[in-house]
């Protein structure tokens, strides 16, 4: 680990992935990428190279995914409210790490974010920024950093919009980076083949 952030990583892994497999038989986060890596494991690994403590939030019944994330080095939080959406899952991760110096929130279906991007977000957050957001060619991506002053607002999140309202109503430090991985997620089998 070249840089060790003071923040806690929150890896959101509680979605249903219905576009990847409408029948719900295969969890996209457990799918193998063309290089053989597992989607969620790779996303966790990249976060853990910068953030020493990562909480992965999964939904109940995702024991195989929890095992993979534990093996990657994450602590796992089961969110009983995961069906209510990303906001509820994020709130569960924040609640489980309320004493943190800040949070770097990443999505488990985004395995190609450059480690340098995670480090840039972490350094900016650790340097005192309130909210840090990476951009690539004008588009907002992940991971997003939140300072400790947002604890209460993050704990109250619910629904499927995640923390978008916080981004819209608070000062955001924008990082323009050359990393298309901040926008690339695995929503379909075609996305996976393109990784």
Give the ranges of each region predicted by the language model.
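Conserved alpha/beta core of the MobA/IspD/sugar-nucleotide pyrophosphorylase nucleotidyltransferase superfamily
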Residues: 1-9, 152-195
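N-terminal glycine-rich phosphate-binding loop and ensuing alpha1 helix
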Residues: 2-59, 63
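Conserved beta-strand segments of alpha/beta enzyme cores
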Residues: 29, 75, 130, 171-173, ...
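Short beta->alpha connector loops at strand-helix junctions that form conserved
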Residues: 34, 77-81, 175-177
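Alpha-helical elements of Rossmann-like donor-binding domains used by nucleotide-donor carbohydrate transfer enzymes
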Residues: 42, 64, 88-92, 120, ...
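Short, surface-exposed acidic-centric catalytic microdomains
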Residues: 52-92
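Conserved beta-loop-beta/alpha segment of the NTase-like Rossmann-fold superfamily
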Residues: 81-148, 152-155
